[in-house]
Design a protein with these regions (language model features):
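Basic, polyanion-binding surface patches
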Residues: 1-158
């Protein structure tokens, strides 16, 4: 039997967040160079934007403790999280002044931090657009390099 909930005009932040969980997404750890140090965070707003030119994007919350550093960044590295890397997802979502403590990384494109742990997909990007949208800013990036593995991506769904 199909169960349909009533339509609601009550689109509060909590309602929207809860109901958008019906839209399955992957999860990515995004890294960059902040103020002289690597920074990174877990996101599920990441998605493909354009094929020609090759653009991807994700949205950063204006309340992020590192918002100014992300706005100043010229690029970012997308690490798509594998199905068995829930710990990596949690690590980069947990508040910390240094999420890179104990994490192996090397300098990649433009010196940006690349996680050594293999992931299904890694994209090194240069920022092409910074587009404010409500309480988030959309960071569009041109894909410069693509690295893949056979690992299966993690899928978040309700
Ligand atoms: C599954 C998941 C998805 C998330 N997606 C986003 C996102 O798309 N954009 C964002 O700014 N924060 C997102 N967050 C929150 C960040 O990972 C982080 O916890 C939060 O921004 C606080 O850290 P910060 O102060 O370094 O930004 C997500 C967290 C989780 C667990």
């Amino acid at each position: 039997m199909t169960c349909v909930t009533p339509t609601t005009p009550d689109v509060t932040p909590a309602v929207l967040r809860e109901q958008m969980a019906r839209w399955p997404t992957g999860v990515a750890v995004i890294t960059t160079i902040g103020s002289g140090r690597p920074i990174g965070k877990t996101v599920n707003s990441f998605h493909a934007t354009s094929l020609e030119p090759p653009l991807v994007g994700w949205c950063i919350d204006h309340r992020s403790s590192q918002f100014a550093e992300w706005m100043a960044a010229d690029g970012y590295v997308v690490h798509v999280v594998a199905h068995d890397q829930a710990a990596l997802m949690s690590h980069f979502a947990t508040p910390s002044t240094d999420r890179f403590r104990g994490v192996d990384w090397v300098a990649g494109l433009d010196g940006m931090p690349v996680l050594v742990e293999p992931v299904p997909l890694r994209l090194e990007c240069r920022v092409s657009h910074r587009l404010p949208a409500g309480d988030h800013t959309y960071l569009v990036g041109e894909v410069i390099t693509i690295t893949t593995s056979d690992a299966v991506p993690l899928c978040l769904k309700r």
